């Protein structure tokens, strides 16, 4: 066994040398301090250290909160250890012995009666440690319990334990008072009545930490309850220990006292402590696969001075996984046991010589109710090249993501609100934020407008009022802003710029004319090309006669040479010549008619009448004329005003509002009216028309409203999905059957064991084993560190529905229709023909947090014969017990001569949750909004518009106009208030007071308009009396007076909206903003443009006449500058 011990020692020492000695302990805090004596707890597993150094371990804290003094007292432990006998060469039950000694340990988790309660009242912390040891080394586990007030007092502090430094980090969750489980906030409660009152009842698996508190008294005889609960036959002689366990649930709770009969949380913990007494293991990362060597059963004396053995143990060697601190049960006085390298007997089916754990960690199932999910608010301000944003939520933010922002991990809490700051690097696109199940959009266009206004106002800071008034007009994005700038520049500096620009244009035209035309109107470029061609022809010799070598001037002359010279004749006078070059050249010198061809060419040329050219005309243009400048100035002002009015409101992308003029479109009913279109699931649709009789002057109002899609699924709740760590442990002993010993993993919820018993090969036994055919190698697989990660629901049926309302004259009808269903009235038929969806019957919906946050769609979720690593492998259904996965792999025992056998497993070791998270992008996801759910049904609306409905609307032409034409409903309008800004940025919200008389209900639409254009509408069902309607719109200008309108009628008074500025921009909910509105109103025409221009001009100067004065000053300055640069030409008197 000596060589094996040295190998284990090396494997334990090496990680200590390589790891850093500073470790993090995270304590999760809710962001409000609730009533009651709540405490929070955190713990951290530390690397192994030599057993001899544990006697000097004392926790030392630098935290501002004092540590409870009673933990500084020394606790006497009976240390039980084992050693091999010198006279035994082979392993057997008698080859080793136990030794009991008394040791003093300081700072272990020996809690006194009322210590936790006193620490809460005195605002002190409890810092202690547990030990998991073998015969050589110990792994400390440091615990810290603090009152919940510490969450408000501290952010971090440092604790020293031996050679290690632990950084305590207080991390606030988004939960108000509850515990964060599966990404949800829940409140464990012992009262089922209060659970039903507060919300949805559910069962959750929660982590719990328990400490034994020794106290004498008849009410603290813990084994009396053990006998009642587990039908034990133990008597008080064998089990005299008195005390109770004090537990903290979920890392944040009031103390729970175990056992307490009327608290089922307490009884759940009590059951876990005595059925699975070892609790969760203390394995570090990388210790999932380990080996034990069982030495054998042993007895020890506790205390060391006892006359007989009082405690049964099992000696082992290998990696320590479970606590080595326990309490002897056979004494009324608390006898503390420290057993490095030995498992104390914690199973109480046999009553004698047992112990109970000093500390216990595990999972219990408790009922709960959910904390509500609150809506959030987000706004952004311009910061450098990007934007700085803040999100708030009253009840906390459980998730916040943005595809174009860097979401900060630093959270701040203000009273009951949680604040999250994040930075967006780009503002050229709108910022989309997903938070608390909502999708909101920050329109960054307004941020850019604000930056523009700020810059222009800063440049002209001498007149800030004037600069701001002009800046808010210039900074409107798109063509409208450029048109505004052109209009102002033309008005102020047109008298200088018009002649200057004209001069530049004339210079360019004259340059072009000079290039392409001569004074005789001949194309100069063509002339140059012709001369180049002639010179090229001369260069290559084509104008030279082949016989006489004379260079001709015209092609006709060359042709005459080609006829006469071969016949020995002069081509000019036809005289006979010798057929040689010299004779011809001598004759040409004396010939009198060599100019014959040149004279013929001159006769064919006729004189042309020359007219003044383009260049001369451009030179004579009088661009300095005051008449020309005034005419162009007036023309440009009118043209730019029209262009400005036409561009005064941008047309946003569908499916949102399109600006139009006042009124409602009309349709003559010659034939049936049919509409066929597709509609995204997040969009509303409003269709409004005035149907007219083509034969007579009769009409009737039609108003159709289709609300956004509601997705409803009937589900079967599959339960909670867990993540866990799979451990592979080898337990070897040289003698005895495999069933002789109880291994610690037997009490794990999910475990599987394969035994190799009584091996007959020498190669599978170490050298100190007694021989062939003895001993056992037990290969154990078990799951620990179980953590609930999500809730799964299987879709049984799915339904897509929309609410349809129709106002036909005075007839008002509504109905909720499904896919392949229709709304049918006497004149109108609205049908959903089909739906394009990514959901189907049999799919499984998995939520990793609150249902409001959306989830994943699984097409192949395993509900039966689940193997470890499948989706749904570790489940806890509500109507069944804990479901463990199958482990389909096979074991193999690896043997080497004279060494301990090692188990190998060829199956999957990665949990299904970890596999899903590694490939999460391959799964379809969905977002939810307006969530309603029960155990059997879930309903939500899709904020992303990922689904589509095929809608068909049919209105028959057979309408009884005589009986339906008159609508008795009377509507009165009044504008109450306005919020927001004009322009195409964030927009404005107009509050309208609408009164309805003469009929009980009326479905119609209220618009937000100025004198020329309407910028938004809201479809609303009015009831008799006074109604408050809020209408949102985008657009308008500084002169717009926004009014509430119904058809052609508007409220008598209007209100001005604020100018877009550098203020914060709030996010807009996509569900509220996604709507398609079609009322057939005409587009803005020329008359509308002039009305809009007049309203703007009157508005820009209304209340700020200094702007007009400043503009006129600039105009006068330009006139003076014109007179200096372009003086009037003086004409001489005749």
Curated annotation (Swiss-Prot):
Signal peptide: 1-18
Record key words, sorted: Disulfide bond, Fusion of virus membrane with host endosomal membrane, Fusion of virus membrane with host membrane, Glycoprotein, Host endoplasmic reticulum, Host Golgi apparatus, Host membrane, Host mitochondrion, Host-virus interaction, Inhibition of host innate immune response by virus, Inhibition of host RLR pathway by virus, Inhibition of host TRAFs by virus, Membrane, Metal-binding, Phosphoprotein, Repeat, Signal, Transmembrane, Transmembrane helix, Viral attachment to host cell, Viral envelope protein, Viral immunoevasion, Viral penetration into host cytoplasm, Virion, Virus endocytosis by host, Virus entry into host cell, Zinc, Zinc-finger
Transmembrane intervals: 488-508, 628-648, 1105-1125
InterPro entries on file: Envelope_glycoprot_Hantavirus, Gc_C_bunya, Gn-B_hanta, Hanta_Gc_N, Hanta_Gn-H, ITAM_motif_hantavir-typ
Region spans: Fusion loop: 756-776
Record keyword Transcription regulation present: no
Zinc finger residue ranges, CCHC-type: 545-565, 570-591
Motif (YxxL): 615-618
Region (Binding to the ribonucleoprotein): 516-533, 588-605, 592-603, 611-625, 1121-1134
Chain ranges on the Lumenal side, renumbered to this chain: 19-487, 649-1104
Name of the featured protein: Envelopment polyprotein
Upper taxonomic lineage: Viruses, Riboviria, Orthornavirae, Negarnaviricota, Polyploviricotina
